[in-house]
Regions:
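Generic low-polarity alpha-helical segments
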Residues: 1-12, 71, 76, 152-154
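Amphipathic alpha-helical substructures
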Residues: 1-66, 103, 117-118
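Compositionally biased, intrinsically disordered low-complexity regions
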Residues: 6, 25, 44, 56, ...
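Generic secondary-structure transition motif, activating predominantly at the C-termini of alpha-helices
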Residues: 15, 75, 79, 126-129, ...
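Short, compositionally biased low-complexity segments enriched in polar/charged residues
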Residues: 45-106, 121-122
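C-terminal soluble interaction/assembly domains
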Residues: 91-174
């Protein structure tokens, strides 16, 4: 809520102050609320979609930059979101949890605005995520390329998961 209030304060001081942030001007991502300058320059989120339906999907969704910051804050040992003054460079993401005989599997792709954004996250939050341990599970956090864009793929799944050989893929719609 506080970030939304800060966005409205920014709005009232910006060149957009004579309009309202509703309808077609409504922000379309938490990134735009967290970084109003990105909103102002039209940095819209990318739509990331899994390319296969999958019969054992438990849940599928987008995290967004706010949730990514919350995860990073938790991994860093803080109870609140990551208070980084540097914008993450989040472009879009999609995660899926999958039912397996040995427990749930998570596959999560994040597309970044630039390779430096991806590399910065891999060296911080990604490194902490990779270090997590869970008996009977394997963790991978790696750089991938999606349609010419810098991305990361996170997989946390049981050691025996058959998807390790061919994990679900995604495509970038925009």
């Amino acid at each position: 809520y506080l970030d939304g209030a800060e966005f409205v304060i920014w709005w009232e001081r910006s060149v957009l102050k004579d309009s309202t942030p509703y309808g077609v001007r409504m922000p379309t991502s938490t990134e735009q609320i967290l970084s109003p300058a990105r909103y102002e320059r039209g940095d819209a989120p990318l739509t990331v979609r899994f390319t296969t339906a999958g019969s054992d999907v438990l849940h599928e969704d987008t995290m967004g930059e706010m949730e990514l910051r919350i995860v990073d804050g938790h991994l860093a040992g803080r109870d609140s979101r990551n208070e980084s003054a540097v914008p993450y460079g989040w472009g879009g993401d999609r995660y899926r949890t999958i039912r397996t005989p040995d427990g749930p599997a998570l596959v999560w792709y994040v597309v970044w605005d630039a390779g430096r954004d991806r590399d910065r996250w891999l060296g911080q939050g990604g490194q902490r995520l990779r270090a997590l341990g869970r008996p009977g599970y394997r963790h991978t956090v790696e750089a991938v390329d999606l349609a010419g864009r810098a991305a990361t793929r996170v997989i946390i799944a049981p050691d025996a998961w058959i998807g390790w050989n061919s994990p679900p893929g995604v495509g970038v719609v925009r």
